């Protein structure tokens, strides 16, 4: 039997009093970056079960640098009629029937994950959340499929736009594999923890912040502070 891994059912949300600086709304054109990682029982979001999901809301410090917030994560019960590919379980080392998994339904999982994200979108003055992920369309596809199956209302994520750390890592470091990209960014990587949703989400969040912050060091023009469209003063500098 597979051992139970990290990411028991829990959620850590921001306090009502905690406000992410509004600068992040200008930085990404009204989008709030939220890292999401899913662990699944296969590649097909319509057929294969969603087993684990984790999210990390990105926030901006007063100096304009990004940092991850506390993670939100839970194990998920396979939906009725879903398929389980043994090869996927061998890869992510999840036992869907483990007695200590404390998994919850897709409906409850979406409520637990997406409600704090909606609150963060509102508190930052953003219009929508944008999913950040490593091969982000895979994660977005499973989130959207779960939303459709459950009839979940008010999904905060943009329906197709993403920030993909595969592309960003290839641009910044010449690497596309998450572990190699993280190491190239100077981040610690523990192979034994990989392929749990919470670990991969936390590491992807650190990587995304490292890339954006590094870019800020290379090009210190803080264009998001230069007016409502964020680009006006940049063109005026030419």
Regions found by a protein language model. Give the residues of each.
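Acidic active-site catalytic centers that drive phospho-/nucleotidyl reactions
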Residues: 37-39, 139, 164, 200
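Active-site-proximal helix-loop-helix substrate-binding element of RNase H-like nuclease domains
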Residues: 76-92, 96-99, 163-202
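Hydrophobic positions within alpha-helical membrane elements
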Residues: 42-44, 98, 140, 169, ...
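Conserved non-catalytic scaffold segment of RNase H-like nuclease domains
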Residues: 2-5, 13-134, 238
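Acidic, Mg2+-coordinating catalytic module of metal-dependent nucleases/exonucleases
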Residues: 130-137, 141-142, 146-147, 177-238
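Histidine/lysine/aspartate-rich catalytic loop segments that bind and position anionic ligands
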Residues: 147-152, 156-171
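Amphipathic alpha-helical interface surfaces
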Residues: 109-113, 139-146, 161-164, 174-178
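Short, function-defining helix-loop hinge/capping sites that tune catalysis or transport
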Residues: 45-47, 101, 142, 147, ...
